């Protein structure tokens, strides 16, 4: 073909981060589909090439690695869609359309300069400084494809990086653009945030930028403390983040982490003031289990056994704590074992993570 070709994106980023990659993106100045077919024909056994002619892309899987080929291109977007109009471009044009500078890095695959490192937007410096920054003005990057706002926060949570100041401001300014993105795509990024080493990093950024109020308003309602007659309750938003982080230290079970997020979700709706005891949230576990269904349905999360599992844990999350009281009966313990069934161990993990008190005697009990 004699078309200049380059490895770009996540593979190059992960090379410098010394992280494994499951996919390799290859950009050529020419026909990406034709290049994919030519490369596949040279491999044994020859993999099946899947093509997307509208975008000029093709991919195949070989040795458990997914290869994606695309012709270098320019993209332009309309105000109400994230589907771009595409035209042929140069390597630099293609790098400009990337979401972040750390994903705009490239290695040449051309025989006369094989392995040459190409960094048009100082992405390696940003990578070394652990900064998430866009190649273009962030307003253009996020307005063109608002899902990139979720990706920025996801990368911050996954890698422990910080958002560049202008990038963070653009997230706040263009947050409403997230409305043109499908719930499925938002949920996919949200799940990646939840599965990150310290999910609170991502949720705090969602909170600070205003995105949380749009994609997950029920969680935002947990924020705040009300004080009456000198008595206040804990901020259930920050408590939830602490529970989530606690649980994330011991499990990578996505749906158990969702149970941590939703275990107190109904506290705003069940909050009551009683002069003799102060604030109460009676029945929040029952209403919360009902809300799991509504939230999963809106976010287009699985409505199968995974949702029911989260409901079960939310409904039962107070039961183990109640067993710490004196004079508890063997029958109460047996009832919990029967009611929790196969989820008992996970329930106990959630219960332990839910203990965020600074009072060591309470923790010990």
Predicted segment positions?
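Catalytic cores of the polymerase beta-like nucleotidyltransferase superfamily
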Residues: 1-365
């Amino acid at each position: 073909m004699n078309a200049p070709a380059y490895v770009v994106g996540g593979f190059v980023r992960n090379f410098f981060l010394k992280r494994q990659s499951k996919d390799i993106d290859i950009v050529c100045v020419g026909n990406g589909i034709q290049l994919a077919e030519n490369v596949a024909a040279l491999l044994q056994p020859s993999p099946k090439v899947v093509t997307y002619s509208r975008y000029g892309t093709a991919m195949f899987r070989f040795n458990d690695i997914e290869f994606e080929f695309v012709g270098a291109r320019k993209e332009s977007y309309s105000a109400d869609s994230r589907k771009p109009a595409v035209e042929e471009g140069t390597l630099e044009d293609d790098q400009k359309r990337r979401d972040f500078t750390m994903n705009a890095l490239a290695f040449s695959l051309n025989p006369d300069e094989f392995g040459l490192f190409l960094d048009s937007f100082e992405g390696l410096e940003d990578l070394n400084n652990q900064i998430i920054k866009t190649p273009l003005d962030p307003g253009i990057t996020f307005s063109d494809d608002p899902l990139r706002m979720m990706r920025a926060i996801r990368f911050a949570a996954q890698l422990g990086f910080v958002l560049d100041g202008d990038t963070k401001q653009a997230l706040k300014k263009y947050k409403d653009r997230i409305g043109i993105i499908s719930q499925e795509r938002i949920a996919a990024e949200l799940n990646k945030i939840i599965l990150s080493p310290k999910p609170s990093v991502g949720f705090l950024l969602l909170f600070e930028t205003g995105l949380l109020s749009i994609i997950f308003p029920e969680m935002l309602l947990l924020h705040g403390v009300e004080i009456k007659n000198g008595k206040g309750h804990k901020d259930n938003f920050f408590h939830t983040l602490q529970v989530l982080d606690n649980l994330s230290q011991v499990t990578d079970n996505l749906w158990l982490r969702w149970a941590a997020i939703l275990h107190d979700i109904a506290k705003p709706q069940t909050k009551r003031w009683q002069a003799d005891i102060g604030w109460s949230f009676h029945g929040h576990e029952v209403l919360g289990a009902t809300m799991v269904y509504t939230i999963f349905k809106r976010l287009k999360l699985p409505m199968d056994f995974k949702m029911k599992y989260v409901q079960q844990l939310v409904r039962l999350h107070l039961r183990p704590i109640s067993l710490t009281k004196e004079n508890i009966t063997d029958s109460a313990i047996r009832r919990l074992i029967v009611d929790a069934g196969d989820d008992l161990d996970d329930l106990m993990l959630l219960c332990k993570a839910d203990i965020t008190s600074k009072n060591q005697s309470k923790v010990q009990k």
